Design a protein with these regions (language model features):
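Helix-to-loop junctions at the C-terminal end of transmembrane segments
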Residues: 1-11, 117, 288-300, 385
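Cytoplasmic membrane-interface "Motif A"-like loop-to-helix N-cap segments
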Residues: 6-23, 298-309
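C-terminal ends and interior cores of transmembrane alpha-helices
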Residues: 19-53, 310-323
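Intracellular loop-helix junctions on the cytosolic face of multi-pass helical membrane proteins
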Residues: 50-63, 74, 78-79, 85-251, ...
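Loop-to-transmembrane helix entry/capping segments in MFS-fold secondary transporters
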Residues: 57, 88-97, 271-272, 354-367
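Intracellular juxtamembrane helix-capping segments at the cytosolic ends
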Residues: 73-86, 341-355
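Short amphipathic helix-loop junctions that connect adjacent transmembrane helices
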Residues: 182-196, 255-272
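C-terminal transmembrane helical hairpin of 12-TM major facilitator-type secondary transporters
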Residues: 296, 302-345
Length: 424
């Protein structure tokens, strides 16, 4: 993102990164597919004795890790496109379309998953490669960027090192929060503490740990990542905080949904039911991602974000008390409505807030809201679910869903902190 802000290519600032990132993605997918050729490799003995894994798994891991780097090259470029080429009064609609297109891979996964069951791995890889190539060509050939005529000055300090330090801070704060949650569970003797008190205390510590790690991680991370400009970009920092609150909640709710269906509803086919739930969320998300973007241009971003948080909270509340499949699907509908509205309105607000000349750097920082969402929601929620499930089977999932509902509400309550809604 920082490098794309200063790119003077004739293609513009963003398209070179989108193009090369997508092409490198294809190379990495070939590495992933190539792992199949190492299944009976004579190198297995070396890899197993040295690293404890087979040669095939080592190549697979290498391809996946490299794919994280190359895909983020493309993502860094595409994130800066909307603030670069879309007028402010149309960014809600553009963000809605962006959210819609980002959901298509979820449908693609549902379509190609049966091919994996049939062991048609290379067909799956070629399909993914075709999508990377097709969407890259569509973007590069259809987008009209105005190239920079001269390279902007370098950001003060060492921005790459600042970004690395930002990541270390975020992970460290999250691990500290996890330690506090585990400690609160140990401080309450199981034989003398009532169950409701343990749920209340550990649950409250968990919510404070999640919300606190998000706030502290983003706040201090932004000081490091943005530098001296952070003092004048408080609205942007609060935007990242609210974004991470919501993404941590919805991502973790989705991740634990199958275990809830399996252990609480005790259905014989939890994977199938979870697929149906994902489809319901996807359908309602599609509806509101476009509509929400349009409405945010007309009504304002924060009003739509408040509605999104309330809808998602209702979805988690319904999920907690769901004991039938139809009720789970109704909960999924509310989660989809809230998520679609949030994704379009929130990104539109973010593109309004970032400085145009540094859009790549700022929106790159917001990537931590996506990556950090999984760290916060799952690393704290997972051990909490295990703790309560050990006390009473199935209890852990309603408890952590309640915490995720709390994050949805906190994301709404913090919206007034975003006092500036545009750089203009």
């Amino acid at each position: 993102g920082m490098w794309s802000d200063r790119c003077t290519s004739k293609l513009g600032r963003r398209r070179p990164f989108i193009m090369w990132g997508a092409l490198l993605n294809i190379v990495c997918l070939l590495v992933v597919g190539g792992s199949l050729f190492f299944q009976d490799s004579p190198l297995n003995a070396f890899f197993q004795s040295t690293f404890g894994v087979t040669a095939s798994l080592a190549v697979l891991l290498l391809g996946i890790i490299l794919l994280q780097f190359t895909s983020n090259i493309s993502q860094a470029g595409q994130q800066g496109l909307i603030p670069d080429v879309v007028q402010e009064y149309q960014r809600g609609r553009a963000s809605g379309i962006k959210s819609l297109m980002e959901m298509i891979p979820a449908a693609l996964v549902l379509a190609i998953s049966p091919l994996l069951d049939k062991k048609q791995f290379w067909l799956v890889i070629f399909i993914l490669m075709a999508f990377y190539l097709g969407t890259m060509l569509w973007t590069v050939l259809s987008t009209k960027e105005v190239p920079l005529t001269e390279k902007p000055p370098r950001p003060a300090g060492r921005p790459v090192l600042r970004m690395l330090l930002l990541t270390v801070i975020f992970v460290g704060v999250t691990q500290l929060a996890l330690w506090l949650v585990k400690g609160s569970a140990r401080w309450l003797p199981e034989d003398t503490t009532a169950l409701w008190l343990r749920v209340a205390v550990v649950g409250l510590v968990g919510l404070i740990g999640m919300a606190g790690s998000i706030f502290i991680g983003v706040y201090f991370g932004a000081q490091v990542g943005i530098g001296a400009e952070a003092r004048s970009q408080k609205s942007f920092i609060w935007w990242v905080v609210t974004r991470l609150m919501f993404l941590a909640a919805i991502g973790s709710t989705r991740n634990f949904a199958m275990y809830f269906v399996k252990d609480v509803l005790k259905v014989p086919n939890p994977a199938t039911i979870t697929t149906y739930l994902t489809a319901v969320i996807f359908i309602f998300l599609l509806i509101t991602s476009i509509l929400g973007g349009y409405l945010s241009d007309k009504m304002g971003r924060k009003k739509l974000l408040a509605a999104a948080g309330v809808l998602a909270f209702i979805g988690t509340a319904l999920l907690i008390f769901s004991r039938t499949i139809p009720m789970v699907m109704v909960a999924g509908a509310f989660l989809g409505l809230g998520t679609g509205t949030f994704m379009s309105a929130n990104w539109a607000l973010g593109t309004d807030l970032v400085p145009a000349k540094d859009a790549g750097r700022y929106l790159g920082i917001s990537n931590l809201a996506g990556a950090g969402a999984g760290i916060v929601g799952s690393s704290i929620g997972g051990p909490m679910a295990d703790y309560f499930n050990a006390i009473q089977p199935g209890l852990g999932y309603p408890v952590i869903f309640a915490l995720y509902g709390g994050l949805f509400l906190i994301s709404v309550l913090l919206l007034p902190k975003i006092t500036k809604t545009s750089q203009n």
